[in-house]
Amino acid sequence: DIDALLKMADRGNKIMLVSSSFTKLLEDTLKFDCTYSYFRSVDLKKYAASLLKRDSIYWIGDPKVYPQQIFRFYPQFCKSYFRQYDSLPVRKLAEIDLAKDMGNALDELDSTTVSRNYHPLVAMVRPWGKGEVVLVSTPLLFTNYGVLDEKNATYIFRILSQIGELPVVRT
């Protein structure tokens, strides 16, 4: 129940929501929009067996806590991202680079437009009352495929560290 979660955050708790499909009510309440992606295991199997390039997720969170770093994941895990989140304050954690797929088509655009539209966030923190809501659009990164792949567990631990000393309950 969204109301119950937001009341917890309002009282000072930290809530982490990891999904590639958030409810419209949650998106409207927290003023964000997330793309939806469909996962096909067949595509992952084909991709994993090849030597194709992986997608990059850039850690852009507080550099005093963690240095900026690039993590490489199978593209099938990084298809969802936040398109709109500007109307309320957010703390940016991680973004994906969509500009590489556009080639020279972006040459005519200014850097602000490119940054906003082609470097969308995949993880962010939205303040809510006395607490926070951590939003992550890449749930498949939290599976064994994502955690056990190369050095990517570091990315997952950085996301989870946003909860701090509070207990983590997975549902």
Regions found by a protein language model. Give the residues of each.
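Extracellular ligand-binding/catalytic regions of CAZymes and related secreted enzymes
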Residues: 140-171
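Membrane-embedded segments
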Residues: 1-54, 116
